[in-house]
């Protein structure tokens, strides 16, 4: 049975980094991405835990929706063996479908105003 992966993947990103990426037309990732050699993304189902574990109490975050279809995404195990999307190159911003500001919601976790994507 062939595994199917979602067409949309997501990145939580500091607004200042995103501003720089918009000027350049490409996103190379945050510090952890550059350190690891790939851009960390999440699926819609993984987003709430990603926000809670890695972005707790961090204001000024954005949720970037990315069309994964044309990208060379590598799916690799991470938290609990769950498969996460990774991009081993810079992200051309033409693949970004939507950018949304997050607010510090319940328990100081950055959250979209209308809830997480399904």
Language-model segment annotations:
Residues 2-118:
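Conserved, structured core segments of small domains
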């Amino acid at each position: 049975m062939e595994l199917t992966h979602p067409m949309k993947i997501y990145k939580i990103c500091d607004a200042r980094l995103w501003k720089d990426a918009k000027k350049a037309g490409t996103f190379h990732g945050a510090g952890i991405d550059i350190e690891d050699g790939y851009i960390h993304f999440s699926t819609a189902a993984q987003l709430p835990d990603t926000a809670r574990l890695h972005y707790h109490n961090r204001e000024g975050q954005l949720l970037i929706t990315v069309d994964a279809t044309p990208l060379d995404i590598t799916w690799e195990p991470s938290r609990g063996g769950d498969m996460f999307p990774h991009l081993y190159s810079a992200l051309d911003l033409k693949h970004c479908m939507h950018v949304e500001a997050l607010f510090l919601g319940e328990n100081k976790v950055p959250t979209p105003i209308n809830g997480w994507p399904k």
